[in-house]
UniProtKB/Swiss-Prot annotation:
One of its GO terms (cellular component) is cytoplasm. Homodimer. Residues 1-374 are annotated as: A. This is Chaperone protein HtpG. The keyword Nuclease does not apply. Keywords: ATP-binding, Chaperone, Cytoplasm, Nucleotide-binding, Stress response. Residues 375-593 are annotated as: B. It is found in: Cytoplasm.
Amino acid sequence: MSELNPVDNQKVDSINVDKSSPELKKHTFEAEVAQLLHLVTHSLYSNSDIFVRELVSNASDACDKLRFEATNDDSLYEDDGELKIRIAVDEDAKTITFTDNGIGMNEADAIENLGTIAKSGTKAFLDKLSESQKQDGQLIGQFGVGFYSGFIVADTISVETRKAGEPADKGVRWVSDGTGSFTVEPITKETRGTAITLHLKEQYSEGEESYLDRGKIKQLVNKYSDHISLPIQMRKEVWQEDEVEEGSDTPANGQMVLTDEWETINKASALWTRSASEIEDEEYIDFYKNITYDMDAPLAWTHNRVEGRVQYTQLLYIPKKAPVDLYTREQQHGLKLYVKRVFIMDEAEQLLPMYLRFVKGVIDSADLPLNVSRELLQESRDVKSIRDGNARRILTLLASLANSEDSDKQEKFAQFYAEFGDVIKEGVGEDMGNQERIAKLLRYATSTQDSVTTSFEDYKARMKEGQKAIYYLTADNLAAAKNSPQLELFKKKGIEVILMTSRVDEWAMNFLTSFDETPLQNIAKGAVDLGDLQDEAEKAEAEKAQETMKPIVDKLKTALGERAKDVKVSTRLVDSPACLVVGEGELSPQMIQMLKQMGQDVPESKPTLEVNPDHPLIKKLESSEQSAEDFDKLAQVIFDQALLADGGQLDDPAAYLRRVNELLMR
């Protein structure tokens, strides 16, 4: 049995476009849409159910936009303020129609919204995606183009729409088969809003994969869209028994028949408005998947009503995986903002500090004005209060995972740190008010433990008696850190050193100079002061070496010229001939290299060369048989080797190799 079109009580027929009509206009999809349509039809067939989620979500957004616009002009409701979404199935025409009485579109809107992707960087992002990522159903929603998911199951899509507040004869019909073009023509549409009709492909209109099964559609709505605050309705079915003659012993047969009554098939209440004690974990997970288009369940979440000077509800999620665009300029971040349950905007980045840009969720404020703009969000004291509250809540959630005795929660924190640890470190320099909270979450490998599990608190608990500082070393990777010449003295004395191998570490440590009143010391910067861990005999020997090596040190300064800021006898080397050291507050070679790669101007900075007086290569410099030319070559080689060991790059690798070869041939 066919259903009536939920908009105009007209039967939904197959599309017959009069291509000779002078009002019919044909348009070509922009390149990004064509690429996306190809992706939809060829890669996402295994996730065909998602079209229900996407089209219901779009309908909900359209109603949210109308509600928002109507706060300034309630005539837009056109005497129909009961917002709703309806889904109609027509078995004869093999169609499904999704209808809303939301904001609607005019011709220009339809061409822009359905024919282009209004997001910068989309094409580049699509080009970068690997084949495995293209199988992920969350891709579609990430671009805000969920409408196109209809082409997974439909060979043709028709859209009939009219913008709220415009006359009936300003309706628009948009039609496409998804192969590269679409047509637009004017129609008369008495009701505002949008009706999207999917003409199902044969494989999706019969058999087990059929979407003409109303029960299946209801299940998908319950799975993906139960939280939608608007009523989602379908025609009610009732059991009707066949008539039997009075007195007959034959049992009555019957069938399900459609009525003219529409029934709501979802809970129709915003999840975050309900008490947390009433919400099942599965409901939280389904809601997360719906608003983020992430196929994975979230790692953790927190749901709270905040009372005080500013009242708001927060429902915040930590994803399981970092998005591929986490570090790109086009990366979309921020929360959905509602004011008194009225949707205001997506991606309200002002509600979170940048280092928490991976957090997803919803904020519903009772105090912000309904006409709040992004500009106003940047200036509002209330928004700052909400942002600070969100940051504290997320950091508290992470701390509860990190400090839990429960192995599952510990594993969740390990997962989180592997995905988002580097982003959290940005907060050390960006959020001074929460710096201590953030520092407690940081984890590192050390010179005695390769696993990235040691916190500053753990390190302090293992410090040697008499140790006055938390020692750390930055490097490009763990292998480079473990083999760094700067570690040699610490290994000899059994002093543990934290090994930092992320590019953001050195930047972050510029802001974190102590932890729990214990200073942090980079062992590759400045002089090494082991304090009580260095005995008097060692100090006396070091002072003696300074005197005996002075002639060689002076010659090295001359040979190296402008390459080195200074040359000194080292107290930190045991096995290596030399190492490079920078002063406190100066940039390391790795940091300089990173900044140059980012195209930034880097201030001139020269390292100090420290030499090991006990190493045979350094002793060779003292040889009276050494010519001035060979001394200079050996000095340059020693400096270059120290630079390489420190993770730097040679300005002239060929010259380095030539000098090494010449010395080897002597």
